[in-house]
Amino acid sequence: WDALHAFRMRLLRLSPAAFIHFGTTRELRALMTEDVKQYAFLDWKRCVLGRASERYALNNAVVEHGCEIGADCYLEDSYVLEQSRVGAGAVLSHVTVRDREVPADVALHGLRLCDGRFVVRVYGAGDNPKEATFLGEPLARLGEWPSLWEAEIYPVCGTLEQAVDAALNLYALARGEGDRAAWETAERTSLRASFNAADTRFILDWEASLRETAQAEALLE
């Protein structure tokens, strides 16, 4: 009471409304690609601010003609350009994918760090950051860390597109392929450290700029 008595409080009842909880990438993907139908009464749609499709869901994303997007993907705040191909069930967030192939059932999440550099975090849609697994395999193949959250496996790069390539190389390494020497010599960060070092002002500006592009594209369709 000592802390709150000076403030007025008001109860607002929103209608129509629904409480929606999701805590994992897999749950987010399911919500946006399938469960969204249950919230039609809230005017929710699979595609908002972007080219509509019955195959995938998006929110504030630009997908150029010529790109192939697999079934049940979720794209947010991203550009998919040129001849890119995105595998089924992939989740893209805050990335630019230009003429690249994104594997199925992975998440690519881009961040600009406060020092102006970029990192793209790649992981399996079903991965649990609290566990020592990566893309469904033991994390020990890459190094000794207690969990994916703490694992310093994500290269820090000068540009976002370089960071996308580094993330795809990391995916290849987990599959026994890729350029391990390039990964080992790169400065790397973790999910935890990159989260704490994210440039939030840049993220908001990125989303606003992309929103303008998506709106302009919609007018030209």
Predicted regions: what they are:
Residues 1-221:
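Left-handed beta-helix
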